[in-house]
Amino acid sequence: MCKDIKILAIESSCDETAAAVVVNGRKVLSNIISSQIDIHKKFGGVVPEIASRKHIENISLVVQDAIKEAGVELKDIDAVGVTYGPGLVGALLVGLQYAKGLAYSINKPLIGVNHIEGHISANFIQYPDLKPPFACLVVSGGHTFIVYMKDYGEFEVLGQTRDDAAGEAFDKIARAIGLGYPGGPKIQEMAKRGDESALQFPRAKFHDNSLDFSFSGVKSAVLNYLNTMKMQEKEINRADVAASFQKNVVDFLVDNTIKACKIKKIDRIAVAGGVASNSFLRETMVSRGRENGIDVLFPAPILCTDNAAMIGSAAYFEFKKGNIAPLDLNAIPNLKLGER
């Protein structure tokens, strides 16, 4: 029988300080998250300098809590996994430096993990029997990709945003209609009271049969609509704006993902990233998948937002391939999927 591999994972790419202990890439023994949402809310978004300082304050206790909750000791850990990009450089460095010091002190391998790959790997935790190949829609505040996962750690990008990420567009429109931060959950709640067909906003069209996305156009259209209504001193139905905007974005995401599956002849989609917790996206993707004979997989909401369990899962598969990082590994804020 093969020995179980326990990974201690650390995530600090944005405003969550997180640590987890994961066994064999699929079983979570602990998953501790210290969120900074309440701190950044008053600024309308994440302030990088503040995020870095809070990571410094929190990381040691978060890692200790993860080890304690897992019921293990440091000597039981086989490797230390850590996000080294993409993300906010200062925030990344806090987690990376801590992980390097810890790996050195306990004489265990260091595994560098791509944050986007981590999001995809959250599905291996939710679905322990899941194996590549499959398609994955990664949709979050900073990233929007359609990816074909050929094998563990092997990806082909089929489509990506050419400007704003979907989650970024959610945040900007939420701010514009006075809903505050974080925008995604607030748009979702407001949209439940609105009419999704009340307003027709444009959607980007590419002439090269591309699977790429663009959300700057719909964002600008919503902002122009709001400005026009204000200039004309007309009442704005925020719920209708939220519902119509959300439908526009979700339909774009779903249409391109289904199209990608048909092109690649794939019958299984995994969805990942913070926006994957959006209930309207979940319902629409599952419904469209069923219509097209495609199985649709979503992680639990706690695994959609930034967490270290997903990093532990991705780190396990890197560990199995022998991809050990040097102790001079540096943060790469613009790290691309598939890069090492």
UniProtKB/Swiss-Prot annotation:
GO biological process, one term: tRNA threonylcarbamoyladenosine modification
Subcellular location: Cytoplasm
Residues where substrate binds: 138-142, 171, 184, 278
Superkingdom of the source species: Bacteria
Keyword Iron: yes
Cofactor note: Binds 1 Fe(2+) ion per subunit.
E.C. code: 2.3.1.234
Keyword entries, A-Z: Acyltransferase, Cytoplasm, Iron, Metal-binding, Transferase, tRNA processing
Family: Belongs to the KAE1 / TsaD family.
Record-given protein name: tRNA N6-adenosine threonylcarbamoyltransferase
